[in-house]
Amino acid sequence: MRHKRSTRRKRASATQLYQTCKASGTCPPDVIPKVEGTTIADQILRYGSLGVFFGGLGIGTGSGTGGRTGYVPLGSTPPSEAIPLQPIRPPVTVDTVGPLDSSIVSLIEESSFIDAGAPAPSIPTPSGFDITTSADTTPAILNVSSIGESSIQTVSTHLNPSFTEPSVLRPPAPAEASGHLIFSSPTVSTHSYENIPMDTFVISTDSGNVTSSTPIPGSRPVARLGLYSRNTQQVKVVDPAFLTSPHRLVTYDNPAFEGFNPEDTLQFQHSDISPAPDPDFLDIVALHRPALTSRRGTVRYSRVGQKATLRTRSGKQIGAKVHYYQDLSPIQPVQEQVQQQQQFELQSLNTSVSPYSINDGLYDIYADDADTIHDFQSPLHSHTSFATTRTSNVSIPLNTGFDTPLVSLEPGPDIASSVTSMSSPFIPISPLTPFNTIIVDGADFMLHPSYFILRRRRKRFPYFFADVRVAA
């Protein structure tokens, strides 16, 4: 067992020790001078400050701001502020007085009237007017004629083709109530005009349902799913339950709980840490609704899942986005499908391996019980005849391979295919006689004349540089 090391207790501060040990006289020798300020450093500062004055420089135990003027870099002068100049008063003129001048100063008399310069306007007085009246005492006489026959007046009007009466137009009736535009005019005009039909967006013609003339918005374009982006993890699902009940891959099924609708977005809550039935669906909190897409010639069933791998203290969930997909079936062209159907129709429907089975679709073969298929010494291409109960025999060529033992051989035709040999045929080399080693014995030889001429050697000149000195 490892021994625990004892921790060192911190010593009390000098101020705390001074308060407790001053009265009893048990203070350490370095406590009292430090608290009372009688150390050697304090005495040097105390007596040295009597002969040296550092006022205004901020040297000492101050705030370290450099005093009132602050710190100034060496070799530079602090910027001086411009002193604002006060306005100079004009000098007062002093009259010189001689000895013979009078000592009485004449005063200037002030007048109470101020001459404005322009005369005051005068208001004209109304002069009045004369009214002359006259009175006539003669009574008024009215001449009244007797009532005669009534006169008939006729008025005839002629139509002027160069002038037409302007038509009086009234505001049209509101078209929102019934959906029809009605224009009325009390007079008939002969103006030529073009009748332009107006489009109305009112659908209902019922006067009870009040609609507006706002056009109906069209369908929005289909947004991109973004299933194959860089931030989305691609996971292929093989389990068929992913199509019908995807919740079984995330959580374990509870029989007492109502089933999920696979066409909606599924939300999951994980209260405790438990593994998912499928490890690919671990930490899934949401499975969005499915989408059918076609990619690379297949019909793909896709769902986007949201994981909650991390959870912060504030409750925010952080996780990756996963694209789960399952390919349903390949999309093939029409011609390939027709060709496959024709090939499928030619295949045999009888899959029995009994020797008594009959395939009526392609051939009729009846094999005997004779053990002829275990002959391992048969040649490369042999013909085996099977006896049947019919009046004729059918001879079918069989290929047993390169003399290899057969474990089992199902009855049926063996179609021989032409096998091309990969080895090339042997071609003899002419001459057929082998070469013998020829040995020539001799003590002398003749040199070819081309070797008598010696090559001229090129002279090698040493290269020296005038500005370089090499030490030997």
Curated annotation (Swiss-Prot):
Subcellular location: Virion; Host nucleus; Host early endosome; Host Golgi apparatus
Post-translational modification: Highly phosphorylated.
Domain of life: Viruses
GO MF entries: DNA binding; structural molecule activity
InterPro entries xrefs: Late_L2
Motif (Nuclear localization signal): 1-12, 453-461
Keyword Phosphoprotein attributed: yes
Keywords: Capsid protein, Cytoplasmic inwards viral transport, Disulfide bond, DNA-binding, Host endosome, Host Golgi apparatus, Host nucleus, Host-virus interaction, Late protein, Microtubular inwards viral transport, Phosphoprotein, Viral penetration into host nucleus, Virion, Virus entry into host cell
Subunit structure comment from the entry: Interacts with major capsid protein L1. Interacts with E2; this interaction inhibits E2 transcriptional activity but not the DNA replication function E2. Interacts with host GADD45GIP1. Interacts with host HSPA8; this interaction is required for L2 nuclear translocation. Interacts with host importins KPNB2 and KPNB3. Forms a complex with importin alpha2-beta1 heterodimers via interaction with the importin alpha2 adapter. Interacts with host DYNLT1; this interaction is essential for virus intracellular transport during entry.
Stated family: Belongs to the papillomaviridae L2 protein family.
Protein name, as recorded: Minor capsid protein L2
Lineage, uppermost ranks: Viruses, Monodnaviria, Shotokuvirae, Cossaviricota, Papovaviricetes
